[in-house]
């Protein structure tokens, strides 16, 4: 089967899936990048020094663009991860010929549904593929199906998807033994580690972690909190730490490469994910679960309803409810065995289900089934299972 993946640029989040697809298709896989990576992303360590041969930089020249278009037209199936009319024209010919095509998208109403803009938006999404019965939706957010259903598009044609960063396989017992709580077990005051990582910007709410630390310290908990990242809120966070006298329990480590962040995840007991509904997916959830962290995450994050089963492989708190967040973190700090169990189940979720190899296998199975006109309910859960409509208020504490 010939497969083409079209996206803005090639990065470390897409590499594992692309490698798996290239292997499974015996080299009949191409990744079409339509633009140069932004300087901000390059500075975050997202750039690949040596791009695989299957990556086509269609923006480099007319010859490259023509080559990409030929591959797109000839492919058995295409994954289209872009928006806008200009980009949509890349798959227009396929859709006219009723060739199997998938679009993948995060949610489109991150900032809420606005009735006054609805008629124009609905028409736009209907014109840009929503009307085409051969175009299916890979939902890179648990809220994608809900958002597109409001426009009347992709009804009963939505599948669970996401981002699939590198999956690491560990000796789980050895890794759990490296967590700070395990290493400090013999200390006079055993200590648990809490990690927060991401850009220090409003939608990610890093300030919530500092108020949490203040509440935990006041109640006498022994912990060390690390905050990784930089951004517009950095000085504000430093000031909060100073004002609340939290220098002894919080460290701000600045920006790091993805590999360095993973090392910190491997040593962390608890991972905090505090973003709001503007967080389309949140690949740090995959990575922290893969690292055996007991994750406490906002219900608003796109990846959370797909990846986390509350109280089984992670804890969910109601977005914006800092008291509920504190309660969930205290549950983990109060019971090391429960915390360890949550971390182990999180690791299993990524190793057994939410990884690039499984996603690639399932995608090809789904594509072949759809090409034959067979039923598309092939999987009960996980990548390529039917994506149900999940509303913003699905979780209440």
Residue ranges and their predicted role:
Residues 54-55, 238-256:
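Nucleotide-activated donor-binding/catalytic signature segment of Leloir-type glycosyltransferases, i.e.
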Residues 132-189:
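Donor nucleotide-sugar binding/catalytic pocket of nucleotide-sugar-dependent glycosyltransferases
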Residues 176-177, 183-204, 210-213:
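Conserved donor-binding/catalytic core segment of Leloir-type glycosyltransferases
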Residues 255-256, 263-268:
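Short alpha-helical donor nucleotide-sugar binding micro-motif in glycosyltransferases
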Residues 266-280, 293:
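Acidic donor-binding loop of glycosyltransferase active sites
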Residues 294-298:
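Short hydrophobic beta-strand element within catalytic cores of glycosyltransferases
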Residues 300-311, 315-316:
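Short acidic/histidine- and often glycine-rich active-site loop of Leloir-type glycosyltransferases
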Residues 324, 331, 338-352, 359, ...:
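A short, well-ordered alpha-helix in the C-terminal region of glycosyltransferases
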């Amino acid at each position: 089967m010939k497969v083409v993946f079209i996206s803005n640029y090639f990065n470390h989040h897409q590499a594992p899936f692309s490698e798996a697809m290239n292997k499974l298709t015996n080299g009949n896989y191409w990744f079409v990048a339509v633009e140069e990576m932004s300087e901000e992303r390059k500075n975050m360590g997202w750039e690949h020094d040596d791009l695989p041969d299957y990556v086509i930089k269609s923006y480099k020249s007319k010859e490259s663009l023509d080559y990409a278009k030929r591959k797109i037209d000839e492919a058995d199936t295409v994954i289209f991860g872009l928006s806008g009319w200009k980009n949509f024209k890349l798959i227009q010919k396929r859709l006219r010929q009723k060739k199997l095509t998938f679009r993948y998208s995060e949610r489109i109403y991150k900032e809420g549904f606005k009735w006054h803009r609805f008629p124009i938006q609905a028409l736009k999404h209907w014109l840009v593929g929503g009307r085409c019965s051969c175009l299916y939706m890979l939902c890179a957010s648990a809220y994608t199906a809900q958002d597109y259903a409001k426009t009347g598009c992709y009804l009963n044609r939505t599948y669970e998807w996401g981002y699939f960063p590198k999956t690491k396989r560990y000796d789980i017992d050895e890794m759990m033994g490296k967590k700070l709580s395990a290493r400090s077990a013999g200390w006079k005051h055993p200590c648990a580690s809490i990690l927060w990582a991401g850009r220090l910007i409003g939608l990610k709410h890093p300030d919530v972690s500092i108020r949490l630390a203040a509440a935990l310290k006041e109640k006498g908990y022994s912990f060390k909190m690390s905050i990784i990242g930089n951004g517009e809120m950095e000085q504000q966070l430093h000031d909060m730490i100073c004002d609340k006298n939290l220098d002894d329990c919080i460290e701000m480590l600045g920006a790091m490469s993805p590999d360095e962040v993973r090392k910190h995840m491997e040593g962390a007991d608890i991972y905090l994910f505090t973003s709001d509904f503007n967080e389309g997916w949140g690949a740090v959830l995959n990575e922290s679960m893969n690292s055996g962290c007991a994750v406490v995450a906002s219900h608003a994050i796109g990846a959370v309803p797909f990846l986390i089963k509350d109280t089984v492989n992670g804890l969910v708190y109601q977005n914006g409810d800092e008291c509920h967040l504190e309660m969930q973190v205290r549950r983990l700090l109060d019971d090391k065995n429960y915390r360890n169990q949550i971390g182990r189940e999180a690791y299993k979720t990524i190793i057994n289900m939410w990884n690039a190899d499984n996603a690639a296998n399932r995608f090809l199975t789904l594509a072949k089934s759809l090409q034959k006109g067979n039923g598309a309910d092939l999987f009960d859960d996980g990548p390529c299972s039917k994506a149900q409509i999940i509303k913003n208020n699905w979780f209440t504490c």
